[in-house]
Amino acid sequence: LQKPLLIHDCGLCCAALKDAPGPYTKYFNFSVGTEGLLALMRDQEDRRAGWDDAIVYIDENGHAHSFSSLDRYGYTGEISETGPTKYLRFEGPERAIGRCFVPTSFGLTECLADVSEEDYQRYRREAPSVWNDFAAWYAARETETK
């Protein structure tokens, strides 16, 4: 692989499950699924959860610079106690566990699968993003090197 190199991964992290499934979210989707996650969380008082977007940029000198949304913003929501009821989105198994995430720090009280299209798009557009953090860092870095 040549440098510079940009690597990205994202996973759902549940505090009560020691940040699992984390990097195994895709596997977890197909092996455990929404109902399995809800079962694992059934008796948990700590329902905090968040999406951990992780970016690693390896510069031309081989130095790694990492950015993590979970480290920067913490848990931004929780796992619903009942799961989605309307399924307005996320019908396929590939995003199964994301269905039951409730972005409470963004002011929403329903699972992402159940919120209106307007609220979903607003969440996608306005929620804190590690990509914005990376872009700001990269722009500042480019300015410094000129």
Segments from the language model and where they lie:
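Anionic-ligand binding patches
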Residues: 1-146
